[in-house]
């Protein structure tokens, strides 16, 4: 098992999860974070840190592993992030919205740290 970041992170990107990860397995996109499933040690300390409940065990993945694939693919090309940055100023406007991945996801990498 590994943990994955899901749709709820898009445009919110709080990053509380980043600083508690003991193996630094988070990677940063412009408006979304992912977990590298090959680096995640399944400890679960990141899951309760997310205020929008975007982090789930891959056993709760929907759509035949959609989120596991997204996390694995983008962890290969986005920079590693180990220090919490500033979340987007407008994040509260998107916290309760659903279907954010299809509407707002950006493939552009973040800055990393």
Swiss-Prot record:
Free-text cofactor note: Binds 1 [4Fe-4S] cluster.
Classification via InterPro entries: 4Fe4S_Fe-S-bd, 4Fe4S_Fe_S_CS, 7Fe_ferredoxin, Fd_C, FdxA, RnfB_subfamily
Keywords: 3Fe-4S, 4Fe-4S, Electron transport, Iron, Iron-sulfur, Metal-binding, Repeat, Transport
GO molecular function: 3 iron, 4 sulfur cluster binding; 4 iron, 4 sulfur cluster binding; electron transfer activity; metal ion binding
Sequence intervals crossing the membrane: none
Residues annotated as domain 4Fe-4S ferredoxin-type: 2-30, 31-60
SUPFAM superfamilies from the UniProt entry: 4Fe-4S ferredoxins
Residues that bind [3Fe-4S] cluster: 9, 17, 50
Residues annotated for [4Fe-4S] cluster binding in this entry: 21, 40, 43, 46
Domain of life of the native organism: Bacteria
Pfam families: DUF3470, Fer4, Fer4_4
Cofactor(s) essential for the protein: [4Fe-4S] cluster; [3Fe-4S] cluster
Keyword Transcription: no
Classification via NCBIfam families: FdxA_Protbact
Protein name as annotated: Ferredoxin-1
Organism, as annotated: Caulobacter vibrioides (strain ATCC 19089 / CIP 103742 / CB 15) (Caulobacter crescentus)
């Amino acid at each position: 098992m590994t943990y994955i970041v899901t749709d709820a992170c898009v445009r919110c990107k709080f990053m509380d999860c980043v600083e508690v990860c003991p193996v630094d397995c988070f990677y940063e996109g412009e408006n979304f974070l992912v977990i590298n499933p090959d680096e995640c040690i399944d400890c679960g300390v990141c899951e309760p840190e997310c205020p929008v409940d975007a982090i789930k065990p891959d056993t709760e993945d929907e759509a035949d592993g959609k989120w596991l694939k997204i996390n694995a693919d983008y962890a290969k090309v986005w920079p590693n992030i180990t220090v919490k940055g500033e979340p987007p100023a407008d994040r509260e406007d998107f916290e309760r919205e659903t279907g954010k991945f299809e509407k707002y996801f950006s493939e552009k990498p973040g800055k990393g740290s």
